Amino acid sequence: MPTINQLVRKGRLAIKAKSKVPALEACPQKRGVCTRVYTTTPKKPNSALRKVCKVRLTNGFEVISYIGGEGHNLQEHSVVLIRGGRVKDLPGVRYHTVRGSLDTAGVKDRKQSRSKYGAKRPK
């Protein structure tokens, strides 16, 4: 327990909140270039081939980003937009690619939740 005099001299240290998405640097999204597009398998109770890409961001960070939706057109050197949001069953994946923005096409034939997948309204 500090004395009053010690508190006057030093003060209490405020606890700093650690960011869950450090590569975004407090921005809502960041642009980057795909350096590798591949599939990976999820953690124990689940089984699938999840589509992910390694992205070199404009600020120099290299992150792994999840590609949501059925099918995608990404390949190496594609320019993508990254947002925060982890994938619980993929360790190390803390970002999502934004569908329907820059080089990422929206999901084809998507009828519901279209705004999340960059799909236009069907005629």
Swiss-Prot record:
Keyword check for Transferase: no
GO cellular component labels: small ribosomal subunit
MF terms (GO), sorted A to Z: rRNA binding; structural constituent of ribosome; tRNA binding
Key words, A-Z: Methylation, Ribonucleoprotein, Ribosomal protein, RNA-binding, rRNA-binding, tRNA-binding
Keyword flag rRNA-binding: yes
Membrane-spanning segments: none
Region (Disordered): 101-123
GO biological process, one term: translation
Biased composition (Basic residues): 113-123
Pfam families found in the cross-reference section: Ribosom_S12_S23
Residue numbers carrying 3-methylthioaspartic acid: 89
InterPro entries, alphabetized: NA-bd_OB-fold, Ribosomal_uS12, Ribosomal_uS12_bac
PANTHER family listed in its UniProt record: 30S RIBOSOMAL PROTEIN S12 FAMILY MEMBER
Family: Belongs to the universal ribosomal protein uS12 family.
Assembly with partners or alone: Part of the 30S ribosomal subunit. Contacts proteins S8 and S17. May interact with IF1 in the 30S initiation complex.
NCBIfam families xref list: rpsL_bact (TIGR00981)
Task of the protein: With S4 and S5 plays an important role in translational accuracy. Interacts with and stabilizes bases of the 16S rRNA that are involved in tRNA selection in the A site and with the mRNA backbone. Located at the interface of the 30S and 50S subunits, it traverses the body of the 30S subunit contacting proteins on the other side and probably holding the rRNA structure together. The combined cluster of proteins S8, S12 and S17 appears to hold together the shoulder and platform of the 30S subunit.
Protein name, entry field: Small ribosomal subunit protein uS12
Record organism: Laribacter hongkongensis (strain HLHK9)
